[in-house]
Amino acid sequence: MQTLADLLNTIPAIDPAAMSRAQRHIDGLLKPVGSLGRLEALAIQLAGMPGLNGIPHVGKKAVLVMCADHGVWEEGVAISPKEVTAIQAENMTRGTTGVCVLAAQAGANVHVVDVGIDSAEPIPGLINMRVARGSGNIASAPAMSRRQAEKLLLDVICYTRELAKNGVTLFGVGELGMANTTPAAAAAIVSTITGRDPEEVVGIGANLPTDKLANKIDVVRRAITLNQPNPQDGVDVLAKVGGFDLVGMAGVMLGAASCGLPVLLDGFLSYAAALAACQMSPAIKPYLIPSHLSAEKGARIALSHLGLEPYLNMEMRLGEGSGAALAMPIIEAACAIYNNMGELAASNIVLPGNTTSDLNS
């Protein structure tokens, strides 16, 4: 069986020659050069992904939602009862949550994965990869052991690769877990890897009262001070101040990239997972597509560090993969213009910036 290191070494580089060909093709379509803006750049980015064989296209679509509870909930950093994680996960199996509705609209399947829900019994309908009944309380201990983090990463990578073998060419990531916008899922990871102070990245999450924000900032600061995560080691950061859902999302990103396929990020938690995943393998960054700008406080800090600019700004902070599902039609639109628009040369049109030699080269 392959190790995590083996799989990380299989991540292919983006194909610059395919991207150059895509650029020439797009410049020769029935439009002024660059007039479709970021759609053109997105199509070129997709063309460079080896898993798409040089032609931007979308086959099957999947949103993988990683569900887990967090021991840091005990610190009073979330207002929702911990039981909501299990209840909402079960609702996902019925297709009634936000991500399920948006994914259905986009024609995507939702895979609900239990990586650490705190329930006595497995929940019917969920994919069971549960490591434990919730992560450790990072204000007083690590979230998990390094071995647990590496095993879950490997399991999720393998699951993602299996979906790719079965025809999925576009992935989205999402999460579900009470208290996960605190150190267990985002703020401590972002603070650790970007070097920014917790006060700059900690937000209200799922409507935390503002009078409790100071406690949340203190919890994040204590978690980092106690656990001393190494910002250069993505696995160490996830194991010490992360959560099982964060590890799972990082695994999807690594798995999709290892197949040369795109993965849509969701909101703030997925940015944190992406920061950790990029520390493990910087080669995955060209495969990451930011769906929307999260309304969480530290969102721009995380995205700036990743060098990513979201396609949507809908003031969303639901999580679940809702933004990833919402952005899937944008990916399909980029593929459609690439594959279905006519060419200037076929209509004997010459525009400034376009030449026949360019179009036919």
UniProtKB/Swiss-Prot annotation:
Keywords on this record?
Cobalamin biosynthesis, Glycosyltransferase, Transferase
The main enzyme category here is transferase
What InterPro entries does the annotation carry?
Nict_dMeBzImd_PRibTrfase (IPR003200), Nict_dMeBzImd_PRibTrfase_bact (IPR017846), Nict_dMeBzImd_PRibTrfase_N (IPR023195), Nict_dMeBzImd_PRibTrfase_sf (IPR036087)
Q: Which Pfam families match?
A: DBI_PRT
What Enzyme Commission number(s) appear in the record?
2.4.2.21
* Key word Metal-binding present: no
CDD domains on file: DMB-PRT_CobT (cd02439)
The record's catalysed reaction(s) read:
5,6-dimethylbenzimidazole + nicotinate beta-D-ribonucleotide = alpha-ribazole 5'-phosphate + nicotinate + H(+)
Q: List the disulfide bonds.
A: none
Q: List, in alphabetical order, the Gene Ontology terms for molecular function in this entry.
A: nicotinate-nucleotide-dimethylbenzimidazole phosphoribosyltransferase activity
Positions of the catalytic residues:
320 (proton acceptor)
The biological process GO terms on file are: cobalamin biosynthetic process
Q: In which pathway does it act?
A: Nucleoside biosynthesis; alpha-ribazole biosynthesis; alpha-ribazole from 5,6-dimethylbenzimidazole: step 1/2
The similarity annotation says: Belongs to the CobT family.
Describe the function of this protein. Catalyzes the synthesis of alpha-ribazole-5'-phosphate from nicotinate mononucleotide (NAMN) and 5,6-dimethylbenzimidazole (DMB).
Q: How does it assemble?
A: Homodimer.
- PANTHER family, alphabetically? NICOTINATE-NUCLEOTIDE--DIMETHYLBENZIMIDAZOLE PHOSPHORIBOSYLTRANSFERASE (PTHR43463:SF1)
Report the protein name in the record: Nicotinate-nucleotide--dimethylbenzimidazole phosphoribosyltransferase
Q: Which organism is it from?
A: Shigella boydii serotype 18 (strain CDC 3083-94 / BS512)
